[in-house]
Curated annotation (Swiss-Prot):
This is Elongation factor Ts. Keywords: Cytoplasm, Elongation factor, Protein biosynthesis. Associates with the EF-Tu.GDP complex and induces the exchange of GDP to GTP. It remains bound to the aminoacyl-tRNA.EF-Tu.GTP complex up to the GTP hydrolysis stage on the ribosome. Its main location: cytoplasm. Transmembrane segments: none annotated. It comes from Rhodospirillum rubrum (strain ATCC 11170 / ATH 1.1.1 / DSM 467 / LMG 4362 / NCIMB 8255 / S1). Belongs to the EF-Ts family. PROSITE patterns: EF_TS_1, EF_TS_2. It is found in: Cytoplasm. Residues 80-83 are annotated as: Involved in Mg(2+) ion dislocation from EF-Tu. GO terms for cellular component: cytoplasm. Signal peptide: none annotated. GO terms for molecular function: translation elongation factor activity. CDD domains: UBA_EF-Ts.
Amino acid sequence: MAEITAALVKSLREQTGAGMMDCKKALTETAGDVEAAIDWLRKKGLAAAAKKAGRTASEGLVGIATAGTAGAVVEVNAETDFVARNDTFQGFVETVASLTLAAKGDIEALKSAAYPGGEGRTVEAQVTHLIATIGENMQLRRSAALEVEQGVVTSYMHTAVKPGLGKIGVLVALKSAADPAKLDELGRQIAMHVAAAQPRYAFISEVDAEALDRERSVLSEQAKASGKPDAIIEKMVEGRLRKFYEEVVLTEQIFVIDGETKIAKVLEKAGKDLGAPIELGGFVRFQLGEGIEKEESDFAAEVAAQLKK
């Protein structure tokens, strides 16, 4: 049996990311055999991961990667903001963002992609490995990508913890033959606008018919309450619909940076200034945890439950 020294425990900890006491126990159980200890930790870790997988993961990070005419964004969730500040977790999200770019935003292709330095593990398997080593439930929640033949895909990260990692990530695609550096500058400003204004659609044509009919019905009922003639009511509804578009459609929104120009006009003017038409190629906005229902815990009940065990 090999002597279980502090150096051996430290080495195992560095290789696995497991806690010091867990590493010491693993070496004791395997008579100091490091490879066997790694396997022992993995087995124990995976068993623990299965229990953790049921817990709500609504914290974490949004990661972004861009490469000229293409860009990708991914959301990886964890249970606590503490883990989001962990170097290992941040490194994982950075790597996954780059892999998302290669996978063109396809979440299934991303999950099955080989994880660099992961000893043959896929990205999905690496998530399970991290659950075991870091000790929290994690989830590769969603991914998306944008690409243009000519132009740029640029990004903006709000509340960034480091470049490309943060809470709100935005991609904006601009199609144009104009100078890429100038386009990138414009795209970043529009991406900042998207982060703040939260549009749901790029163009009016993208607003789904059901949402539009529902909005028109609500506005019509509101207008009828005024008791005005039908012709006036119709004009009131159309006016309010324009307001609705300004709230949810990016090209119809007022640019937050100047507070007076519609995004469509901003693009039109920039195209004239740069000597080439500029067309919006789309946008993606990921906000960490949006749509996830967080668990409301009753601390007293949790303590009582633990005392009964």
